[in-house]
Amino acid sequence: MSTREEVVVTGLGVVSPIGIGVDAFQESLHAERSGIRRLTLLDPSLLPVQFGGEVVDFEPKQYVRPRKSLKVMSRDIQIAFSAADQALIQAGVSAGTIDGERFGVVFGSDLIQPDPEETYLAYRACLTDDGFDFSRWGEASQTDIYPLWMLKHLPNMPACHIGIAFDARGPNNTVTLGEVSSHAAMAEAVRLIERGWADIVLTGGTGTRVHPTWIVRNSVTEVSHRNESPEHAARPFEAGRDGEVFGEGAAATVLESRTAAKRRGAKILARAAGFGSAFGRATDGGVTQAAIEQSIVGALRDAGLGADEVGFVAAFGRGTRTADEIEARAIRAVLGDVPVTVPKSFYGNLGSGGGAVDVVATVMMLQTHQIVPTLNYEQSDPACPVNVVARAQKLAKPVALVLSQTPMGQAAAVCLIGEA
């Protein structure tokens, strides 16, 4: 029997294509409302993919403080800060109410894409009739790019800004590992508490893939091109799927020891019970079935649970032909006919923010005892032998697994247990 301290969830925050804040987010999930739409924050007419999961009506001045920090905050940082603020408010944590030296931050982040207009003048100054003259870049970058530009795009900035603003003077770390960043960050946050290095840790992830540079660079990969019907583009495990859908978003989770939560009188939302990770890259790219299986088995072992105790899986569901087949076979091999849903069918692949948003969705399903459906699942694919939830259904067992993976071969799983 394990004697380690249980780690619980006491606060959630989310900025997503289906809502800003947990109430709006949950309402959209239950209303089965897609957040995939034609892009509006940039002119998509010249882009090969003109839609995605975009966060609309986000006003950073409502959340970011001090306001002057906005000058050195990219959109990824802004939405991360907002999600963190929401989570801490829900958990009842504020500066002065806890020991700052026992308060940590571990966040997942992508390599943050710069906006083209930020480097346009410097780039143009280097153009010649023969192409790009690299010898001019040193001078042009010094004169035509904002001096603090780099601070807007370092992946550790979300954790830094959050730590400074909320007086979190304990362990502070950033994980940059593609789509599994949030999972790895959450695992590290739990270990900090279990090792006794912190009482409370804010964890989460942030990312955007509806960025023009990202879209252009990745549009030649297996990406859905349903520009005429974007709300039907995200179709994980479905027979008619034609590629993944990009999105943007951030989420944050407040974790603390059960002892600390009870001492504060905090409401416990769920338990962060186990984590598993593995690596295996297929010869033709993508993660291997064995790696996904290993991550699932590892998370269950860490939680001290058996496969028959899992109530549902929040699958990664990339939406490509091969990736979905591999993930489906792995789930079937370890967990049998367990119900499977894909939250990202609502908002797309959010990069390093996706796992954190999936965790928020999963905690909500555990709280409401209801599994939300996978949108656009109309026709099953025999090559994906999983029990996909196409219509909302009651949750029979209060245990969930949240899966993630990267095209480079990383696989990760988080095990969450609902609170009675």
Task: Annotate each predicted stretch with a short phrase.
Residues M1-S69, A91, T259-A273, V360-T374, ...:
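ACP-dependent fatty acid/polyketide chain-elongation machinery
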Residues W197-D242, F275-Q289, A315-E325, V338-V386:
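Acyl-CoA/ACP chain-elongation machinery
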Residues D23-S28, P114-G131, I193-E194, I215-E228, ...:
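A glycine- and small-aliphatic-rich helix-loop capping segment at beta-alpha/alpha-beta transitions
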Residues A80-V93, P155-A168, N172-G207, V245-A266, ...:
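Active-site-proximal alpha-helical scaffold in enzymes
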